[in-house]
């Protein structure tokens, strides 16, 4: 199985769930950028302090700062396989990630696109019951995904790295399809 993966897909497609399952089964390190940011802040590292100051102002953490955190994590893995989830979110970030991986003598082996119909995504996200998950907010998040993140599909497809996995059905059914596509 591939050892350096990237997950992309719309909110509610099950990226976090499937990433956790795959990493546990295959001994990969799950690098979720949201979790990495929170971990750096909790640890009080220099990068964490910088990220915390930005987040406390209600601003988005810069691409450079996220890249620095990703670099730090990848360097610490000493060759262990990884799955990157939540970054890159746009083509500019993907273009910035490539030279970083080159410096570390690593590369993305496969990009997994979890695909799902919008109506199913909306139903899933509403069923989670999060306070900020109302239908208009969810539809706005899907639109932001289409504008910013969806161009990554073409970017990675042009590089021959993209595989699509149907993310409809049960968690187990999706995992089965995912495992088969990565075999």
Curated annotation (Swiss-Prot):
One of its GO terms (molecular function) is ATP binding. Keywords: ATP-binding, Cytoplasm, Kinase, Nucleotide biosynthesis, Nucleotide-binding, Transferase. ATP binds at residues 12-17, 128, 169. This is Adenylate kinase. Residues 32-61 are annotated as: NMP. It catalyses: AMP + ATP = 2 ADP. Its EC number is 2.7.4.3. Pathway: Purine metabolism; AMP biosynthesis via salvage pathway; AMP from ADP: step 1/1. AMP binds at residues 33, 38, 59-61, 86-89, 93, 130, 141. Belongs to the adenylate kinase family. The keyword ATP-binding applies. The gene is adk. It is found in: Cytoplasm. Consists of three domains, a large central CORE domain and two small peripheral domains, NMPbind and LID, which undergo movements during catalysis. The LID domain closes over the site of phosphoryl transfer upon ATP binding. Assembling and dissambling the active center during each catalytic cycle provides an effective means to prevent ATP hydrolysis. Catalyzes the reversible transfer of the terminal phosphate group between ATP and AMP. Plays an important role in cellular energy homeostasis and in adenine nucleotide metabolism. Residues 127-133 are annotated as: LID. GO terms for biological process: AMP salvage. Monomer. Transmembrane segments: none annotated. SUPFAM superfamilies: P-loop containing nucleoside triphosphate hydrolases. It comes from Synechococcus sp. (strain WH7803). One of its GO terms (cellular component) is cytoplasm. Pfam families: ADK.
